[in-house]
Amino acid sequence: MTDMRAGAAAPTVSDLINSGVDYAKSAKAAIPYAVAALGAMVLPAILGPKLGGVLGFVCGVATLFVAMMAAREAITGEFGYRDSDPIAVLKLIGVCILIGIVIMIVSIPLAMLIAGGVVGIAIFSLLLLAIVVALVSRIAFLLPALAMNDPISIQSMLAQTAPYWTTLILLFVATALPNVLLSALFGGVGGFFGVLIALIGAVISVALGLVSIGAVSRLYGQRARSA
């Protein structure tokens, strides 16, 4: 694996993916993360909007807690809860809400500028995905920074011009691509196979999500924190 410490050559997408897979294979966070994340995805669909929505929200918050602990495990090798985690999760929720607001503000005029139809929808989806990936990649280090209780702000992350930002964008594209292709190929399938494909997509999302957390957190711990 390529050395990702400060002063070493900027890692490639392959390096990051290998690093994330290496973490995910032995992560103590793997099972609790999978249970919480899958619960957040499937419970609303199985139990309905009321009970399922409440339990899905609880699982979503639990996912953020486990993601925080997973990021810390990827950096330190230790998996466990810290007293600083609740405040860190609240900050993370706030950032997620902020990202959602930004995406909503951007998507409305973008949708108005693009013609309708299948081609228009495809172009809109790709542009919106590009905006989301670019934004998330710029603040990717927020999760591991909060996990380690390091001082960091969105402004400081957006101001950074480190050589691996492009690599982070490509990492998120690579980990999102399987589900994008799955939706494109089987999005209109209904019935049992539709449910099966949705479950497969959820499992893929969880697995690649853990890989991404491991890759970004290790990059942050080995390079960004010592830069």
Regions found by a protein language model. Give the residues of each.
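Membrane-helix interface and helix-disruption motif detector
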Residues: I46-F57, M112-G120, V189-V195
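Short, small/hydrophobic-residue-rich motifs at membrane-helix boundaries and re-entrant hairpins
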Residues: T2-D3, S26-F79, V95-S107, A176-N179
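Alpha-helical transmembrane segments
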Residues: G48-T63, G120-V133, G201, S205
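Hydrophobic, well-structured mid-protein blocks that either form specific transmembrane helices
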Residues: D83-L127
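Nonpolar helix-loop interface/hinge motif
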Residues: M1-A45, P49, L129-G194
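Juxtamembrane transition segments at transmembrane-helix termini in multipass membrane proteins
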Residues: T2-M4, V58-G80, R138-N149, T167-A227
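Hydrophobic alpha-helical transmembrane segments
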Residues: A30-A34, F57, I93-G94, A122-I123, ...
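Interfacial transmembrane-helix boundary/kink motif in multi-pass membrane proteins
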Residues: L16-A27, G77-I101, Q155-A159
